[in-house]
């Protein structure tokens, strides 16, 4: 959800949600041949899975510009890496029904602002790295008498792949789409484990973020009467919001699959300068790579990172305990409580809104909101959200509770920061006294050499003449620069090339105090960075934790002119951040209303799909909790709006430095000073640290795109586009691919589309023949069954197939007749509980003591403790871990009687119609949506002749908060219309 460190926080607080993936590996024979994994065999993880969803951008990015190995040489090598990675993930999960591959398409306007910030930062860093490389080459040549080996020159000068190309509408995304279609068809023809799969490919031409296209599919299938409520889902991706999205489906058999980003295999890490194993950039000597074998064919490469499961079902168990409130005047509903928890997480961070100043996940911001919610739930009379809609009156109660604590939160934060700073200085002084100033002496006590300190960022110096020509070639970085403790962020953020250049520069300034060439006397400054490419929460970025920002001294942090811990902070905040008169209170309330509108948009996006493609939050900063006034009077509604075309999004999010990804006709708009939109593409932009210490945490103050002005400029160039470019600017469709191994579906499609009896060019799938898949398929013009399958790229890295046994058709999701409901479906069988009574009691006792954490480290909880993790106990299948032990359901609140496992009433039948499209200030009552789940009194089973519907029990009082459950069990609306 855009929450920095959210995954780490969740996995630490709720340790049993994590377990390691058991993975079969291909068998390598003595002659070097490989026997692939037989995925037709049972899954070694002890459970079979139906559907696997790949958020493909989480695969494409690490494959195209990896952190732990040399980058692929070209796009074809990248595609081969994507194939290998995808194959590995599919082999782990072994889906038996559906594989969905979703690539990010055009995003809603609300997401474009975040994309714009990331891409501008990325381009700025790439430009600085390129400048560093050019200066490094010049200095290396000077050091080596004007000569550099070909291999060393290639290592330094190779132009890095521009990751901004991984955006809809670029040629790279066309190549990716063609390659993925080929790969899936190839696997359907050649791999028995894939033969019966139905593969849905939603490439970058289909609008929407990848994970949200996946969720739209899950919701569409869930609304079908033929949906199996015990479908087992796995979604792969690196974003923490996948966890929230998994919860929001209310499908209990849901797992998130991801790499264990905490795992660090030091031996496998590669040097960023020379590309060799066994050392990092700080210890690089600049030596040429030693080949393992005549052609380096014996190089074993990098060890594979392990993968981990995140069990949404276990997280639901934890939340059932944590969110339980005893003695409620209405029935506790876990499904609604989980939705409220997701809503509260939105305040701490998401991809569309800045987090509230008082809330940081590292400071237990979610705990703070949860406590307020639990304290007020009985008096609110019901839940804050319903199926993605917000009860604004109840939301006001939560915000008022936070506002009362806001001043103390800021003061407590300052006290904690001061204590940390004091402890740091104390330890630093202790180290200096003890002679432990860090590696190689460290920068904590720089020596004066020849009467001066190192002018480059206070780095330690060596005496003049200390190095001979022989020594110059064997220097390591740590002899000159200690990046991990550098007081300036611009040192810690430097590329490997810039660090090596700084080393050479420092050395040269000592050994040659009077250079002959005047140009050498004042080389350009390095690392004057206003932005960092380190993304929030990206724990895979090296040294992310050590990146600091420019400061007035090594001891002082950046100046904070808002000073949230002092009286008058609100006036200073709006004056400094919004440039508004501190007396303009109505403006503050307007910002609060815009933020509430954003919360309404985000929640609908998570639960129902995109409510508006054009809405966005028009500020860089969030309001204070005290600025949310009278929000219950708001009437929020959204217009669906227009979806941007790919080139329009590219022009919205790309900097001019990445214009190569756009057709040339647009370049002038980004470069010409007379362009009507030149102000959208600043080369330099401010990063506001906003009270933070690390550059990657700062706010990029880029101008917001004025869409009417941009559209007028971009659309004026459309007539100049070539036919190929125009095709890249069009919207595409989802594709369904399957093979003759899926006999019933294969025969039906061939009969209706390609036989003498063929009829209409589209038809509705029969779930009995498609193994449960609902939707409509349409014939692809120009597609001929049983034709040749051609590899689409130039070097023929993969074979052609003379006879393609797969079929490809367009696919449309089924249109639901109602909104997605926050309920468990009839017939669902909940997984075996993972939490024991001791786990539950531990959580409750901590909550009663006001504790913040999940479990003590001294307890044996059966949680995962894989390589690189710091958890309480080693995961063990026999310790009562996920789905293994004889645990129990968490006890219900005191006022309720928990049902036995498998009790009926998990929400029956087709849900009622959607609520209105607008928000109103009338509060929701509790007659609606008291769907059954963990720890609820479900009431008696439906009578045999009763119409299905929500299980309600009680009189459904019209008074707010007094109804004890759902709609009437008679299966009718209040106006007597039957809903089935």
Curated annotation (Swiss-Prot):
One of its GO terms (biological process) is rRNA processing. InterPro entries: 5_3_exoribonuclease (IPR027073), Xrn1_helical (IPR041412), Xrn1_N (IPR004859), Xrn2/3/4 (IPR017151), Znf_CCHC (IPR001878). Residues 503-514, 535-554 have a biased composition (Polar residues). A zinc finger (CCHC-type) spans 269-286. It is found in: Nucleus. Residues 890-903 have a biased composition (Pro residues). It comes from the Eukaryota. It is an enzyme of class 3 (hydrolase). Keywords: Coiled coil, Exonuclease, Hydrolase, Metal-binding, mRNA processing, Nuclease, Nucleus, rRNA processing, Transcription, Transcription regulation, Transcription termination, Zinc, Zinc-finger. One of its GO terms (molecular function) is zinc ion binding. Residues 111-133, 413-461, 491-560, 845-980 are annotated as: Disordered. The keyword Nucleus applies. Its main location: nucleus. Residues 413-424, 952-962 have a biased composition (Basic and acidic residues). Possesses 5'->3' exoribonuclease activity. Required for the processing of nuclear mRNA and rRNA precursors. May promote the termination of transcription by RNA polymerase II. Essential for vegetative cell growth and chromosome segregation. This is 5'-3' exoribonuclease 2. It comes from Gibberella zeae (strain ATCC MYA-4620 / CBS 123657 / FGSC 9075 / NRRL 31084 / PH-1).
